[in-house]
Amino acid sequence: WIMGHMVNSIAQIDEFVKLGANSTETDVSFDKQANPEYTYHGTPCDCGRDCLHWENFNDFPKGLRKATTPGDSKYREKLILVVFDLKTGSLYDNQAYDAGTKLAKNLLEHYWNNGNNGGRAYIVLSIPNLNHYKLIEGFKETLKKEGHEDLLEKVGHDFSGNDDIPDVEKAYKKAGVTGHVWQSDGITNCLLRGLSRVKLAVANRDSGNEFINKVYYWTVDKRSTTRDSLDAGVDGIMTNYPDVIADVLNEAAYKKKFRVATYDDNPWETFKP
């Protein structure tokens, strides 16, 4: 999965897919009542990027829906996975459940079109704080109440705070999550970070006793870091330059071992070579 980083305006969806992304990441900010408000990152952000692209949250999922609904003029077949980077740092811990409820209602209406030929992409809810695990409960229970439990087949999870892997596992146990787990690791491209925790996550994924199904590393903009990430065995790479990742995947050393994921590849299944 080549994951386009910080895709916060509708126009950027196309821009990143054209560069080779089959997945995008979008920042979601919340208002004081725990409603998703904007797709917005703000300053500071990654080096070399404009941090200020944004949409109202109600509008972004509609644009995303068009890009991921077969038959729509804006449809982009390659775009199969979307990570919502939920900026819950502005919320109190006790608002996490409400945030999940409100996010579910919003996506149900504006992205899934109330279950009537909505967008087809898989969605990862990425939460920065383990204490906000109730967001997952709020999201799931809302879709069930609204009669759309089937859509949970399209929803996965990530805790993005670079916490110790056993602590992440505990948070999932509290939330009742038993699958559909992506594990991120990384840091802004302005700083360096080694791959030691990525390797621990990959080891869990491949242990046969795993709670992690997929591992992705962010933010990777250089060919050398891309090669190191692939050598470590990641499933996804989040990047500001999807074309760089696509180029490296075409190198002789990687061409036979890796390919770009398609819609038929289940993002919740651990890959077994």
Curated annotation (Swiss-Prot):
Q: Which cofactor does it need?
A: Mg(2+)
| Reaction(s) this enzyme catalyzes, per UniProt | an N-(acyl)-sphingosylphosphocholine = an N-(acyl)-sphingosyl-1,3-cyclic phosphate + choline; an N-(acyl)-sphingosylphosphoethanolamine = an N-(acyl)-sphingosyl-1,3-cyclic phosphate + ethanolamine; a 1-acyl-sn-glycero-3-phosphocholine = a 1-acyl-sn-glycero-2,3-cyclic phosphate + choline; a 1-acyl-sn-glycero-3-phosphoethanolamine = a 1-acyl-sn-glycero-2,3-cyclic phosphate + ethanolamine
Family annotation (CDD domains): GDPD_like_SMaseD_PLD
Mind naming one GO cellular-component term on file for this protein? extracellular region
What is its subcellular localisation? Answer: Secreted
Tissue-level expression reads: Expressed by the venom gland.
Residue pairs linked by disulfide bridges in the UniProt entry: C45-C51, C47-C190
Give GO terms: molecular function aspect only. lyase activity; metal ion binding; phosphoric diester hydrolase activity; toxin activity
Which keywords, in A-to-Z order, does the entry hold?
Cytolysis, Dermonecrotic toxin, Disulfide bond, Hemolysis, Lipid degradation, Lipid metabolism, Lyase, Magnesium, Metal-binding, Secreted, Toxin
Please list the residues that make up the active site: H5, H41
Catalytic EC class: lyase
Give the binding site residues for Mg(2+).
E25, D27, D85
Assigned protein family: Belongs to the arthropod phospholipase D family. Class II subfamily.
- In Swiss-Prot or TrEMBL terms, this protein is called Dermonecrotic toxin LruSicTox-alphaIC1a
- Taxonomically, what lineage is the organism? Eukaryota, Metazoa, Ecdysozoa, Arthropoda, Chelicerata
